[in-house]
């Protein structure tokens, strides 16, 4: 396994590149969510359709798994008396560390943040006034300490609002840097999935942006099992791979929440599992390995390291892994499993849970493109060449693909 792992760690990121002209990057969404084009890859062949036809492409008995995370208004702007503008980008909660508890805080909380124009914020606190409902409130920010390249910021505010309400009233929704534009009012709606509900992401799980409530209802009526999980998407999603080989790239940690109900349904798998987006893929695959860790007697199964999936025992079935997690739910008398993953999925990885995925078209030399390569092998070249030569739109607001995982 050490030799195989070394081979995977030595994958060169330049082998996963392609030329993406700027005009192929969708700067704005189409007028209708389901109007996007859909590339279908199955049995090694490529077909083209419209996303509105998804209701006819999926079959009764299949399980369709969505990430129900909701993008927060993570960008906060403070203007100093000197006129300098300080941007504080909220990355993840620090105190309380639990997302739900942090958003429910009524007077203060702490977050791990990135700060723009930090050189203009030498000392002291900064504040901004904002309107929520018909009243005006004040949000104050102060630096607590630096930690691993980020700043821990303590927020405090007046009026008894929850921090969720503070962000809604004071913050702006983030948009990917590669769009090269500020967020607009339309992004408030279109940069959220129609099924989003669990606050915590600073980027949307964009594969789900194409789904409408009508499509979801049609799929349910058809007998497709629609299921949900939560993974909060961090800013690390946009971080480029700067290392020459993927073994020298550090993945970001992502927080996930899984219900007992979903684990039990995965244990009783009766049809194909189709993940909506790479975040759902990483969550489902991480869940399998967490079950394997518990089977191996490891108490820290709540966390999954970047390369652990390649060093753990490889011969457990999905059912066995899910049974191990069901045992934890029973013992702990819990209905939710809260965990963290830094899993990296690269070509050579064998998918244990999913059979297919919906995903948009990703940036060159990205870990997301490696994840696609793990699913379809060298055919990723064929898929992306087809998309480029057939007028598909790329990245967050771009078109979609339905990729069947090649089974070795």
Walk through the language-model features, giving the residues of each.
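Surface-exposed, charge/polar-rich loops and edge strands
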Residues: 1-408
